[in-house]
Amino acid sequence: QFSNIDIHSMVDSFNLSLNDFFENTSPDSTEENIQARVRGTLLMALSNKYHKIVLATGNKSEMAVGYATLYGDMCGGFAPLKDIPKTMVYRLSSYRNTISQIIPERVITRPPSAELAPNQVDQDTLPSYDVLDDILKRFVELKHSVAQITEQGHSLEVVNKITSMILKNEYKRRQSAPGPKISGNAFGKERRYPMTSKFKP
């Protein structure tokens, strides 16, 4: 069953309530995240009312760099893609469609986006997921250093940016829903780093 709930009035109400507090500031991801949190609230209300579990949709790549909204798209009781990198999600989707076409092709071929702002795509602020997932595998699963990763041909600037994002978003991952483990070093119980004191390895 597919249903649509219009969230415009709810998002507008939040923004109106925050107008005085946000005076003399420019719109940024704060306002964008309100949309995700409104959706999360509605999904959890439906879950509560009908005794169903909400599935969190975040994958390992997004969880690694914090491309998820706490109490928004991270809400849910189980995260089936939690340990699956984005590039593998695409491959699994394409494979599933060889059995029967249930995933719209546009979902697989369009540029990935959080869809919280017009014309927004993930690659505005991230490298391609092919690059990101390779860095992620080397840093998290193989436990390579920044120097070892750059020796594989990756830009030092990009590697520093991605590894820094991974470390800074430990606090988000601690609050994420549980999910299956398929890798040699999954986020959660296996890989836990400090969240405070400006920790740097």
Model-identified regions with their sequence ranges:
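ATP/NTP-dependent adenylation/nucleotidyl-transfer catalytic domains that generate, transfer
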Residues: Q1-P201
